[in-house]
């Protein structure tokens, strides 16, 4: 072991056997990440819990009694944080976690294993919310990567655009959308879409996001409500 620049003991992973360099680097980073260690101590399922915590500590959009939807929720770090803040474990709000993957139970969280891209998903969600809309739709999804940077950026932006479209179908007027994005030149359409549908749109980089990552979050507040489709003029 050696100390890093902050004085903490640093664990070094020795390469051996058939471990790939990428796997070694990932494991080395995990073992030396203070947020990973803190998540274990605090009982969170992922370090991502601190990203949502930091964003909400600054902007205060999670409130007691809200209806919240967590897209791509597994393993559940964001759901854990949101459930505490809205009080859903004590019956003061409702949190619906959606993912294609299975997710272990979390107090105060209702899990739905489904594809939010399915055309029936918005109606299914509203049914789970008792016929009402959501106050907050949040997403920490990143999707699968190919290793080809431009392709991955387009895929990620496409996923967030789909999440934003889903949010526009289920949010109440005044609602909030928060989602992970990656800094690139491919998100102009997404930002235009959000600025059209929300009163305020901003980018946020919480301290828990690794400094060497292009990861950041888009926070859109004040949903304007679904705009009615323009009607064609009738012939006299």
From Swiss-Prot:
One of its GO terms (molecular function) is rRNA (uridine-2'-O-)-methyltransferase activity. It catalyses: uridine(2552) in 23S rRNA + S-adenosyl-L-methionine = 2'-O-methyluridine(2552) in 23S rRNA + S-adenosyl-L-homocysteine + H(+). S-adenosyl-L-methionine binds at residues 76, 78, 99, 115, 140. It is an enzyme of class 2 (transferase). It is found in: Cytoplasm. Its main location: cytoplasm. The keyword Protein transport does not apply. Gene3D superfamilies: Vaccinia Virus protein VP39. The active site is at 180 (proton acceptor). One of its GO terms (cellular component) is cytoplasm. The keyword ATP-binding does not apply. Its EC number is 2.1.1.166. It comes from the Bacteria. Keywords: Cytoplasm, Methyltransferase, rRNA processing, S-adenosyl-L-methionine, Transferase. It holds the Pfam family FtsJ. Specifically methylates the uridine in position 2552 of 23S rRNA at the 2'-O position of the ribose in the fully assembled 50S ribosomal subunit. Belongs to the class I-like SAM-binding methyltransferase superfamily. RNA methyltransferase RlmE family. This is Ribosomal RNA large subunit methyltransferase E. The gene is rlmE.
């Amino acid at each position: 072991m050696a100390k890093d620049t902050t004085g903490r003991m640093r664990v070094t992973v020795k390469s051996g056997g058939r471990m790939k360099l990428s796997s070694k680097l990932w494991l080395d980073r995990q073992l030396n990440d203070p947020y990973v260690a803190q998540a274990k101590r605090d009982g969170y399922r992922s370090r991502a819990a601190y990203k949502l915590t930091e964003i909400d500590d600054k902007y205060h959009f999670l409130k007691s009694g809200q209806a919240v939807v967590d897209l791509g929720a597994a393993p559940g770090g964001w759901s854990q944080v949101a459930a505490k803040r809205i009080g859903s474990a004590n019956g003061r709000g409702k949190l619906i976690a959606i993912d294609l993957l299975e997710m272990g139970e979390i107090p105060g969280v209702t899990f739905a294993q489904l594809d939010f891209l399915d055309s029936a998903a918005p109606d299914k969600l509203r049914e789970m919310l008792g016929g009402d809309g959501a106050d907050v739709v949040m997403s920490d999804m990143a999707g699968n990567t190919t290793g080809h940077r431009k392709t991955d950026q387009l895929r990620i932006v496409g996923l967030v655009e789909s999440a934003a479209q889903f949010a526009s179908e289920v949010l109440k007027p005044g609602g909030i959308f928060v989602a992970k994005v990656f800094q690139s030149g491919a998100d102009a359409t997404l930002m235009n879409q959000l600025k059209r549908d929300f009163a305020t749109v901003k980018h946020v980089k919480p301290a828990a996001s690794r400094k060497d990552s292009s990861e950041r979050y888009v926070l859109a507040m004040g949903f304007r409500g679904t705009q009615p489709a323009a009607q064609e003029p009738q012939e006299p």
